[in-house]
């Protein structure tokens, strides 16, 4: 199955290409592209197994996020990775925001990437496995209260203001903040903000558990 790498950085292209070839993907099956038009065409032509996208490639175009969203929806069997364009922040974790969409950064560990792509590589070797690690995939969700609170938090409200508006104790607000940080796997507010914004841009938003 083909692989697509959408990144304007030659160093990253080289690194990801080498990584994929070491894992057994032939170079002729790796497409290097720069923009969304190419991504759309290649996805339609090749039906890729994995697409690796640098957020920098689409954040500067006005309708780019909507186009990326449509591509992801149109290819449910393709595993998409979006590497956040976030500077001076070290984030080694990853988040499944949809069954076929992972948000991470270029600081992700090779061992983590290995585990996320393990099913894909097994499939390359014609082993009988489900696509990716989808049998174990559970996109992260927030409770309705956490979702409401996160919106206020990201809008600049502090704990006391959130406490007053939601009519809950400040201690409860702090507890919800802790849960959100745990689910997004970081204590860094800048990373949390970036993850939320990116998820809103390329999907319908973070899943909310309505129960």
Swiss-Prot record:
Job description of the protein: Component of the Rcs signaling system, which controls transcription of numerous genes. Binds to DNA to regulate expression of genes.
UniProt cross-references to Pfam families, sorted A to Z: GerE
Domain HTH luxR-type, chain residue ranges per copy: 135-200
Annotated CDD domains: LuxR_C_like
InterPro entries from the UniProt entry: RcsA, Sig_transdc_resp-reg_C-effctor, Tscrpt_reg_LuxR_C, WH-like_DNA-bd_sf
GO biological process: one example: regulation of DNA-templated transcription
Keywords from the named record: DNA-binding, Sensory transduction, Transcription, Transcription regulation
Name of the protein: Transcriptional regulatory protein RcsA
Similarity-based family: Belongs to the RcsA family.
Ranges of the DNA-binding region feature: 159-178
One of the record's GO molecular function terms: DNA binding
């Amino acid at each position: 199955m083909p692989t697509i790498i959408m990144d304007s950085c030659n160093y990253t292209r080289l690194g990801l290409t080498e990584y994929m070839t070491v894992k057994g993907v032939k170079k002729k099956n790796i497409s290097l592209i720069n923009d969304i038009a190419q991504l759309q065409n290649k996805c339609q032509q090749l039906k890729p197994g994995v697409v690796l996208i640098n957020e920098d490639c689409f954040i500067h175009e006005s309708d780019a996020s909507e186009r990326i969203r449509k591509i992801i929806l149109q290819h449910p069997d393709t595993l998409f990775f979006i590497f956040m364009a976030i500077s001076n922040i070290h984030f080694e974790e990853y988040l499944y925001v949809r069954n076929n969409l992972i948000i991470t950064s270029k600081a992700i560990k090779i061992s983590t990437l290995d585990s996320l792509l393990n099913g894909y590589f097994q499939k390359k070797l014609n082993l009988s496995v489900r696509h990716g690690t989808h049998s174990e995939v559970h996109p992260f969700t927030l409770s309705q209260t956490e979702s409401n609170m996160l919106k206020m938090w990201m809008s600049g409200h502090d704990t006391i203001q959130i406490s007053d508006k939601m009519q809950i104790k400040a201690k409860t607000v702090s507890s919800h903040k802790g849960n959100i940080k745990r689910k997004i796997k970081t204590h860094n507010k800048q990373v949390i903000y970036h993850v939320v914004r990116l998820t809103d841009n390329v999907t319908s938003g973070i899943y909310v558990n309505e129960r």
